[in-house]
């Protein structure tokens, strides 16, 4: 059993590739259930955002896990494996655990410390629970990821003054126009990204805001909160001819604004430039728009320069979060180690309770005149004796699981108590950890915790 991450993000794939491999939120449950049917996949969670698509899986073998996840991605999006492979990254075991914690804390985001990703991790976790695509390992691991992210926000300043992609879009507009107080901004899409853009625009004292959304009521609700004007989608072309700035994030599967629409709007603009930022994945705006005179088109990847300036200021704080993550990884490993001793403890309890039950049957045969109350008291007290006798051996077995020679000692433990452990898949195997010379032990993870792998 191994933990594996297969995915791509803004560092490994440009936006034109990411948009081809992006899951709709409504697809996540179906995708996870489908992936669960693949050979080698024991547990899985899919996380898909504008900047990343990642599959987290518990697999029985790393090489087969990689193969079937790559095949699943290619099949789901109608691509060839060879077209997908160059953009994929792989993390294994402790590298996978560390990566998840970094993602949840916002350390792996384009915008260091952003908190939106935590909500997306929690959302995917909830879907996986509903679809029953996860078990013991991921239930524990993802709860811990949420916990470490909350700790990073509470115990450090990583989330303070963190810019968002929407903030970066507004900053880019400010760099081009200087001041925004006399500009007309069109926000296309009333989702979370559109809301963040509206907040940042309000902070910059924007002159006029128009919100257009496929659902007019949502446009009206968002516009009302930021003193803007809502409009329906059929007014899009007319508004394009009036606005100075467009920030788009609809989540549509096809282009919402085409080159022809911008060319048509351009005829009424009298030479005024139109600045457009497409922060949607898949993209809302046809890349061919950049060929139109007076139209300046930027996508989410063009915002990295602005984000980089923010990154410098946040590196010291990020180091504090890294220390938290290191401690949480150790805690997860310790928990994982205890899984190896679970079947041993279960076998010990089962044997003791069998002896107690046989003893009670013998007493009942030899002392048939005992009342029901007397038998109940005897049953209670004999079980109490069993629990007291088992307490120290069980605690010792748990301590043994974390020791360097755990496998040898647990074998001796089983021999002493003559235990028959049926679940051989849960047997304890040594794990060589790269940091230091000690070994950890956990159920059926013979390859151990490896760092990020390449393929």
Swiss-Prot record:
Entry's Gene Ontology BP terms: protoporphyrinogen IX biosynthetic process from glutamate
Keyword Oxidoreductase: yes
Keywords, comma-separated and alphabetical: NADP, Oxidoreductase, Porphyrin biosynthesis
Catalyses which reaction(s): (S)-4-amino-5-oxopentanoate + tRNA(Glu) + NADP(+) = L-glutamyl-tRNA(Glu) + NADPH + H(+)
Superkingdom classification of source: Bacteria
Enzyme Commission no: 1.2.1.70
CDD domains on file: NAD_bind_Glutamyl_tRNA_reduct (cd05213)
Active-site residues from the entry: 50
Domain notes: Possesses an unusual extended V-shaped dimeric structure with each monomer consisting of three distinct domains arranged along a curved 'spinal' alpha-helix. The N-terminal catalytic domain specifically recognizes the glutamate moiety of the substrate. The second domain is the NADPH-binding domain, and the third C-terminal domain is responsible for dimerization.
Subunit structure: Homodimer.
Protein family membership: Belongs to the glutamyl-tRNA reductase family.
Other facts: During catalysis, the active site Cys acts as a nucleophile attacking the alpha-carbonyl group of tRNA-bound glutamate with the formation of a thioester intermediate between enzyme and glutamate, and the concomitant release of tRNA(Glu). The thioester intermediate is finally reduced by direct hydride transfer from NADPH, to form the product GSA.
Protein known as: Glutamyl-tRNA reductase
Organism: Bacillus pumilus (strain SAFR-032)
Lineage: Bacteria, Bacillati, Bacillota, Bacilli, Bacillales
Gene of this entry: hemA
């Amino acid at each position: 059993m191994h933990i594996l991450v297969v995915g791509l993000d803004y560092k490994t794939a440009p936006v034109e590739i990411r948009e081809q491999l992006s899951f709709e939120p409504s697809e996540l449950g179906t995708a996870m259930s489908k992936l669960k049917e693949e050979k080698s996949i024991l547990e899985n969670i899919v996380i898909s955002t504008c900047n990343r698509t990642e599959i987290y899986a518990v697999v029985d073998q790393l090489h087969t896990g990689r193969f079937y996840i790559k095949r699943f991605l290619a099949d789901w999006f109608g691509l060839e494996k060879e077209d997908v492979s160059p953009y994929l990254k792989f993390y294994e075991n402790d590298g996978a655990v560390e990566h998840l914690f970094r993602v949840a804390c916002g350390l792996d985001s384009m915008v260091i410390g952003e908190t939106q990703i935590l909500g997306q991790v929690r959302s995917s976790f909830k879907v996986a629970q509903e679809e029953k695509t996860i078990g013991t390992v991921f239930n524990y691991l993802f709860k811990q990821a949420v916990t470490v992210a909350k700790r990073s926000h509470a115990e450090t300043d990583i989330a303070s003054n963190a810019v968002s992609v929407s903030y970066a879009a507004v900053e880019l507009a400010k760099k081009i126009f200087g001041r925004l107080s006399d500009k007309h901004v069109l926000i296309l899409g009333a989702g979370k990204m559109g809301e963040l853009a509206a907040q940042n625009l309000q902070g910059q004292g924007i002159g006029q805001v128009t919100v257009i959304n496929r659902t007019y009521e949502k446009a009206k609700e968002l516009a009302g909160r930021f003193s803007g004007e809502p409009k329906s989608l059929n007014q899009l072309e007319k508004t394009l001819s009036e606005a100075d700035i467009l920030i788009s994030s609809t989540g549509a599967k096809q282009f919402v604004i085409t080159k022809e629409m911008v060319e048509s709007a351009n005829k009424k603009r009298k030479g005024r430039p139109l600045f457009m930022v497409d922060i949607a994945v898949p993209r809302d705006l046809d890349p061919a728009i950049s060929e139109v005179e007076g139209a300046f088109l930027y996508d989410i990847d063009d915002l990295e320069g602005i984000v980089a300036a923010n990154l410098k200021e946040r590196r010291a704080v990020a180091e504090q979060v890294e220390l938290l993550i290191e401690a949480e990884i150790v805690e997860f490993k310790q928990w994982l180690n205890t899984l190896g001793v679970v079947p041993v403890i279960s076998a010990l309890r089962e044997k003791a309770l069998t002896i107690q039950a046989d003893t009670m049957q013998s007493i009942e045969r030899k002392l048939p005149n005992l009342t029901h109350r007397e038998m109940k008291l005897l049953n209670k007290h004999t079980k109490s004796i069993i629990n007291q006798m088992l307490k120290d051996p069980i605690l010792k077995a748990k301590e043994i699981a974390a020791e360097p020679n755990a496998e040898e000692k647990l074998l001796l433990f089983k021999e002493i108590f003559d235990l028959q452990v049926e679940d051989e898949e849960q047997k304890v195997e040594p794990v060589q950890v790269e940091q230091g010379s000690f070994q950890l032990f956990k159920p059926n993870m013979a390859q151990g915790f490896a760092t990020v792998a390449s393929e």
